[in-house]
A protein has these predicted regions:
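Polybasic/polar functional segments that serve as interface/processing modules
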Residues: 1-115
């Protein structure tokens, strides 16, 4: 899991992204499509067409980092807007990375009774 400070801004790039893109291609998409600066320290999250893989672009002040996660089962929950970006919290990103619906997180663990 990526350690994300609670005050960090996280942007979801809505729609579908060519997940084959690397740092340069995603940085260009942030600038041209989202109209934001990829070098300010915000996290930018992109989802592939199938929905089972995301990439996160982040500039930490020293350089760009690119993180990727693919789910073994299921798909990442994503906003239905076709273009633009949606801001979410660091906690919502943590839910997303765990494969949980970040819009309505539900605790699913139920302890079993002993005996």
């Amino acid at each position: 899991m990526i350690p994300v400070p609670s005050g960090m801004r996280v942007w979801l790039a809505t729609g579908k992204t060519d997940i084959r893109r690397g740092m340069n291609g995603l940085s260009l998409q942030v600038q041209e499509t989202l109209g934001r600066d990829p070098f300010v320290g915000d996290l930018f999250v992109f989802r592939g067409k199938r929905g089972d893989m995301i990439k996160i672009l982040w500039h930490d002040g020293l350089g760009l980092s690119l993180y990727a996660k693919r789910l073994e089962r299921g798909r990442f929950v994503w906003p239905s807007a076709e273009s633009g970006s949606v801001a979410i919290s660091a906690a919502q990103l943590a839910y997303m990375l765990d494969g949980i619906d970040w819009r309505n997180p539900v605790h699913t663990f139920r302890p079993e009774r002993a005996g």
